[in-house]
Amino acid sequence: MSDKTLTRMDLSEAVFREVGLSRNESAQLVESMLNHMSDALVRGEQVKISSFGTFSVRDKSARVGRNPKTGEEVPIQPRRVLTFRPSHLMKERVAAGNRK
């Protein structure tokens, strides 16, 4: 496993190299795509990217948790959580990469 992290700048640079837009236009394109995805998730919509996966927001209800050190019951507030479900193709690509 690598310690490398793919950043916005890396994505912008890839768009610049592969699509041929200027660096500024590439950065704007990446930022616009991420904003569209974020806005859709905030509205509770799914973001499905073919051959990659699906991002969605789930509502978790309130529940009672337990402090592992003391054993004391602690209320956990209801919240929204972001989930990602990779496509079968993405799962296969990751698994194939692990076999190298």
Swiss-Prot record:
InterPro entries reported in the protein's UniProt record: Hist_DNA-bd, Histone-like_DNA-bd_CS, IHF-like_DNA-bd_dom_sf, IHF_alpha
GO MF terms held by the record: DNA binding; structural constituent of chromatin
One Pfam family hit: Bac_DNA_binding
- Which GO annotations describe the biological process of this protein? DNA recombination; positive regulation of metabolic process; regulation of DNA-templated transcription; regulation of translation
Q: Give UniProt keywords alphabetically.
A: DNA recombination, DNA-binding, Transcription, Transcription regulation, Translation regulation
SS bonds (residue pairs): none
The record's Gene Ontology cellular component field reads: cytosol
The UniProt similarity line reads:
Belongs to the bacterial histone-like protein family.
Fetch the PANTHER family from UniProt.
Answer: DNA-BINDING PROTEIN HU, INTEGRATION HOST FACTOR SUBUNIT ALPHA
Q: What does this protein do?
A: This protein is one of the two subunits of integration host factor, a specific DNA-binding protein that functions in genetic recombination as well as in transcriptional and translational control.
Query: HAMAP family annotated for this entry?
Result: IHF_alpha
Subunit? Heterodimer of an alpha and a beta chain.
Name the chain's protein.
Integration host factor subunit alpha
Which gene produces this protein? ihfA
